[in-house]
């Protein structure tokens, strides 16, 4: 049977969480212990999760791609079909989007940048930014959204973020994670520029999550990207 909830002798109450709680702030520099755990102690696991998002999106993009060898007519026909589902100049929705999208994006950036100081981080902040992009798309359509965010943009942004994350933590592969300290100092706990590499990793995760969330919505909406 399952162990009783909250019991002091539960198997999970061992030296591992005790190490996180007692030494997490000193070793990671992150006031938010959860962020210190997933982006420092378990950074490789988080890197794998980010790669799963990117690979899943790329796989769907490949499956839904249009073969250019079939001619330009099929591409033009698909683009025409996409425009059928464009919003019909909904004044109310566009007005609301003009008001809400900027603070939504700013709040998402705030959640990412302050993930090591309190609740938040790359996953939640990226989801907020992705929601803002989806709202903008629903209000103004593909024609305006694709001026600054296309499938190619997503691929390069995600590839760059994942490459930066991998390079930032790759030294552990060669050291075996044996108490090697980051070249970036931990700083003063509670300051925005603290916790060493965690702030950079949060930004990388946020970019991947925001792009993946928006791209999946686009693919569900028009059957490709």
What is the role of each PLM region?
Residues 1-23, 177-180:
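Interfacial/capping segments of alpha-helical transmembrane domains
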Residues 29-61:
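Individual transmembrane alpha-helix segments
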Residues 53-62, 131-137, 201-214:
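Hydrophobic cores of alpha-helical transmembrane segments in multi-pass inner/ER membrane proteins
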Residues 79-100:
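Membrane-water interface at loop-to-transmembrane-helix junctions
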Residues 112-121:
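Membrane-interface helix caps and helix-loop-helix hairpins in membrane proteins
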Residues 138-153:
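Alpha-helical transmembrane segments
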Residues 151-183:
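A structural-propensity feature for long, helix-poor, extended segments
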């Amino acid at each position: 049977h399952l162990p009783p909830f909250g019991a002091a002798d539960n198997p999970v109450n061992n030296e591992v969480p005790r190490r996180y709680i007692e030494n997490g702030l000193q070793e990671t520099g992150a006031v938010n212990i959860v962020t210190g755990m997933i982006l420092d102690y378990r950074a490789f696991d988080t890197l794998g999760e980010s790669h799963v998002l990117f690979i899943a999106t790329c796989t769907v993009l490949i499956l839904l791609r249009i073969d250019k060898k079939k001619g330009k007519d099929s591409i033009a026909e698909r683009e025409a079909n996409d425009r059928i589902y464009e919003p019909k100049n909904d004044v109310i929705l566009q007005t609301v989007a003009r008001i809400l999208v900027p603070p939504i994006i700013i709040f998402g950036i705030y959640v990412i940048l302050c993930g090591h100081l309190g609740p938040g981080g790359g996953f939640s902040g990226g989801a907020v930014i992705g929601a803002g992009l989806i709202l903008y798309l629903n209000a103004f359509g593909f024609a305006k959204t694709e001026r600054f965010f296309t499938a190619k943009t997503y691929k390069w942004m995600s590839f760059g973020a994942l490459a930066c994350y991998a390079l930032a933590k790759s030294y552990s592969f060669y050291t075996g994670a044996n108490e090697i300290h980051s070249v970036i100092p931990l700083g003063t706990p509670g300051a925005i520029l603290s916790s060493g590499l965690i702030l950079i990793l949060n930004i990388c995760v946020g970019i991947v999550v925001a792009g993946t969330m928006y791209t999946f919505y686009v693919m569900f909406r028009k059957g490709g990207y």
